[in-house]
């Protein structure tokens, strides 16, 4: 089936791989004045892969969510306190993200923030407006054990 895989390392190298069973496209990070980010949603965002998107637009506004992320970083709303301001972004404070109140059969499964400096993951399981972001140290612990 189709999928998006987000890859990043501690050095700041990051990409998204948009995949179908027969084709893949590696999408580079988006670079802004205050750094680079990768973002993935429930659809393909590269022009090359859009024709292979099986959702045919029935993707719960994933392109709108993707645009909200890019706009928030390009406008420098996300700066200084990256973790805190990114939590606000994912809660929908800067535009549409996960506000599916009128969709009884669709919910956000989780929202994640990856801190490449500390190798810590912050994750809200469920709607980030209702669920707290908790620290997930599994990656950090795995690397520390070596």
Model segments located where?
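C-terminal, well-structured catalytic/ligand-binding subdomain of enzymes
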Residues: 3-146
């Amino acid at each position: 089936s189709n999928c998006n895989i987000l890859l990043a390392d501690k050095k700041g190298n990051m990409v998204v791989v948009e995949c179908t069973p027969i084709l893949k496209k590696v999408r580079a990070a988006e670079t802004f004045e205050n750094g680079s980010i990768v973002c993935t949603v429930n659809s393909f965002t590269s022009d090359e892969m859009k024709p292979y998107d099986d959702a045919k637009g029935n993707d719960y506004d994933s392109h709108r969510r993707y645009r909200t992320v890019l706009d928030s970083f390009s406008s420098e709303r996300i700066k200084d306190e990256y973790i805190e301001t990114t939590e606000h972004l994912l809660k929908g404070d800067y535009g549409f993200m996960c506000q599916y109140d009128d969709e009884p059969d669709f919910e956000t499964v989780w929202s994640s923030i990856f801190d490449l400096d500390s190798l810590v993951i912050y994750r809200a399981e469920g709607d980030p407006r209702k669920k707290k972001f908790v620290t997930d140290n599994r990656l950090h612990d795995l690397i520390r054990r070596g």
